[in-house]
Curated annotation (Swiss-Prot):
Its EC number is 2.1.1.182. The gene is rsmA. Pfam families: RrnaAD. SUPFAM superfamilies: S-adenosyl-L-methionine-dependent methyltransferases. GO terms for molecular function: 16S rRNA (adenine(1518)-N(6)/adenine(1519)-N(6))-dimethyltransferase activity; RNA binding. Specifically dimethylates two adjacent adenosines (A1518 and A1519) in the loop of a conserved hairpin near the 3'-end of 16S rRNA in the 30S particle. May play a critical role in biogenesis of 30S subunits. It comes from Aeromonas hydrophila subsp. hydrophila (strain ATCC 7966 / DSM 30187 / BCRC 13018 / CCUG 14551 / JCM 1027 / KCTC 2358 / NCIMB 9240 / NCTC 8049). This is Ribosomal RNA small subunit methyltransferase A. It comes from the Bacteria. It is found in: Cytoplasm. GO terms for cellular component: cytosol. S-adenosyl-L-methionine binds at residues 19, 21, 46, 67, 92, 114. Signal peptide: none annotated.
Length: 271
């Protein structure tokens, strides 16, 4: 009897967080959401056994895939219907410079993939660094992560991931997916999300490192009031000057308020 970790002759590798999508209905729904068009600059992260690659590539002349697993990268290079269309980059997406895919005459990046759940959060942070060169991103993620991405102030799911992602992108949940759509089946529900980078952001952080610090320090102690969690860099009186109540908890602050505090901090560091 074949192991449930084996799909199309490939054994899923736990260290790569591999769960292969095989449900045709779900695949069709994702491809429809991506809506690939000839001439666009499409990039897939972790194509695996090409469940999404094949239907997307059928509508494209060329596309790029970034695959860490050398066995899967080799399969893609020899794939009978894909090898002429694909540029296969054997690399770790967490360290890859996606800006190198913006060659002469190429449009903004459209990135998609069934992301390994064990690296999805840091990978999204990495991809946000390229937001000014990205048209949109479509990812299959753990449902809980999609809820965190889309969460607003006042909810338990709202945190650093929500604020930092929403600073760069509009977050649009697209589709919920059960474990049975994958082989091997994960122990959690999944969901597809669309991330659309803001073209003309109305909220601008002077130093993104300051915004990251404010989010990290705030949500690292989310039961504390911001008067206490931010006490090592801003006083209660200074928060009041910004029009922010020091009795609030971090989860009650809006994106605009986080950026306001971060910009105040950036100004202090420049002074």
């Amino acid at each position: 009897m074949q192991s449930n970790k084996v799909h199309m002759g490939h054994t899923a590798r736990k260290r790569f967080g591999q769960n292969f999508l095989h449900d045709r209905y779900v695949i069709d729904q994702i491809v429809a959401a991506i809506n690939p068009q000839p001439g666009q600059n499409l990039v897939e992260i972790g194509p695996g056994l090409a469940a999404l690659t094949e239907p997307v590539a059928s509508q494209m002349d060329k596309m790029t895939v970034v695959e860490l697993d050398r066995d899967l990268a080799a399969r893609l290079r020899e794939h009978p219907t894909l090898k002429e269309k694909l540029t296969v980059i054997e690399a770790d997406a967490m360290r890859f410079d996606f800006g190198t895919l913006m060659g002469e005459g190429k449009g903004p990046l459209r990135i998609f993939g069934n992301l390994p759940y064990n690296i999805s959060t840091p990978l999204i942070f990495h991809l946000c660094e390229f937001a000014d060169r990205v048209e949109d991103m479509h990812f299959m993620l753990q449902k809980e992560v999609v809820l965190r991405l889309a969460a607003g102030p006042g909810s338990k799911a709202y945190g650093r991931l929500s604020v930092m992602t929403q600073y760069y992108c509009q977050v649009v949940p697209v589709l919920e997916v059960g474990p049975g759509a994958f082989k091997p089946a994960p122990k959690v529900d999944s969901a597809v999300v669309r991330l659309i980078p803001h073209k003309n952001p109305t909220i601008v952080a002077k130093d993104i490192r300051c915004l990251n610090r404010v989010c990290t320090e705030g949500f690292g102690q989310r039961r504390k009031t911001i008067r206490n969690s931010f006490s090592n860099f801003i006083t209660d009186a200074q928060l009041t000057e910004l029009g922010i109540d020091g009795n609030l908890r971090p989860e009650n602050l809006s994106l605009e308020q986080f950026v306001m505090i971060a910009n105040w901090l950036a100004d202090q560091q420049q002074a």
